[in-house]
Amino acid sequence: MDEFLNTLDALGLTENTIVVLTSDNGPVLDDGYKDRAVELVGEHRPAGPLRGWKTTMYDGGVRIPFMLRWPAVVKPQVSDAFVCQMDLLASFAKLLGVTYPDKLDSRSTLKAFLGKSKKGREALVIEGMFNYAYRKGDWALIPPYRNHPHCLLYNLKEDIGQQHNVAEKYPDKVKELTDEFEALKESTGKKTKF
């Protein structure tokens, strides 16, 4: 990355070039490769305080780093805006004045990407391998799947590590989020029920 950024500097392109650095999923250690990752990780926690890893619907598997650099426009800052990689399409299309099919899942969160708003998406369906999660505001809902027969609900504002399932404590919130999730899924033609 350093070489790439230095090349932009050398070519005089830094100020007007958008650079995005992100990942496709959270960390993974025990993935079947004989790389000794589990033994070598020691006390290090690759996902920090987040629970889970790649292939899980916990934030450790789906909350990923996202850095955007555009020196002429975006001032250095940290943001907690809720954004998603698929929103790059709609956001860059808006930035460039380009139209795109409105049936896509991409939504413009351009103001958040440019540091002009602390608010991004309101909600997001996250799909993994045979499992889903639904995020809305401070809430994360993980519907039942495979070996998990019960719905999981987490208040991320109070429990970023997703250690305390509060589904039984907030049945109305579970119903609200489940109904929204099912409606969104149905609108895409997905037949999977939980």
Locations of regions flagged by a protein language model:
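A structural motif
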Residues: 59-64
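C-terminal cap/loop subdomain of S1 sulfatases and analogous C-terminal strand-loop tails that border
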Residues: 27-57, 69, 73-156, 187-191
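Intrinsically disordered, low-complexity polar regions and short flexible loop motifs
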Residues: 159
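Metal-dependent active-site segment of extracytoplasmic phospho-/sulfohydrolases and closely related
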Residues: 1-34
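Surface-exposed helix-capping loop/turn segments at secondary-structure junctions
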Residues: 3-16, 94-103, 182-194
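Extracytoplasmic/secreted proteins, especially bacterial periplasmic and envelope-associated proteins
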Residues: 3, 12, 45, 87, ...
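Structural scaffold positions in well-ordered secondary structure
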Residues: 1, 19-21, 65, 88, ...
